[in-house]
């Protein structure tokens, strides 16, 4: 079975948010269309506590229960089967969806007999990359849907693509899904 994983498509990572990815909102319609092609759609959220050490390196963003931590308003959340919260502890950065603290993502995927993970979301060179690397390490076939991800810095995005390719992550267009 295959699953679509939507990484951190939250208000604070979209234009106008506290840690916005330029044009991050452009992934939303692509992701909404992709959802129709999957039986299983999962999502991750950054969900930081006020005193998180994560904010030593980043502006405050995605504070738990805040408007900034909510999914982008145009994202079709009715199609999302489960949400995995990450970065929930004071000393937890939580870049990868596999670092979720409310549920074990790998265990959940294995129980659902998922072998292929298609990843979408924000930001390519941070949470998308770390999620893809962890998924590959855990033995899943990993695909990044190119039109369904967005990053902050083009050079860093290219370096992230190379790092992901080195561990077998594949890149596909939305049409190929």
Enumerate the language-model features and the residues they cover.
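Alpha-helical scaffold elements lining the catalytic groove of polysaccharide deacetylases
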Residues: 90-112
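Short glycine-rich phosphate-binding loop at a beta-alpha junction
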Residues: 41-43, 114-120
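Short active-site-adjacent structural elements
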Residues: 126-130, 151-154
């Amino acid at each position: 079975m295959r699953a679509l994983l939507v990484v951190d498509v939250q208000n604070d990572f979209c234009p106008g948010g506290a840690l916005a990815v330029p044009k991050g909102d452009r992934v939303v319609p692509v992701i909404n269309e992709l959802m129709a092609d999957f039986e299983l759609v999962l999502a991750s959220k950054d969900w930081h506590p006020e005193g998180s050490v994560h904010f030593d390196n980043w502006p405050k963003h995605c504070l738990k229960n805040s408007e900034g931590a909510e999914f982008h308003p145009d994202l079709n959340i009715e199609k999302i089967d489960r949400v995995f919260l990450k970065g929930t502890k004071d000393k937890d950065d939580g870049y990868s969806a596999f670092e979720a603290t409310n549920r074990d993502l790998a265990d959940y995927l294995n129980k659902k007999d998922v072998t292929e993970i298609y990843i979408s979301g924000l930001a390519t060179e941070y949470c998308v990359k770390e999620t893809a690397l962890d998924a590959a390490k855990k033995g899943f076939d990993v695909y990044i849907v190119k039109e369904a991800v967005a990053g902050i810095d083009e050079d860093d995005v290219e370096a992230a693509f190379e790092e992901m390719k080195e561990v077998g992550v594949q890149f596909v267009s939305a049409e190929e899904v």
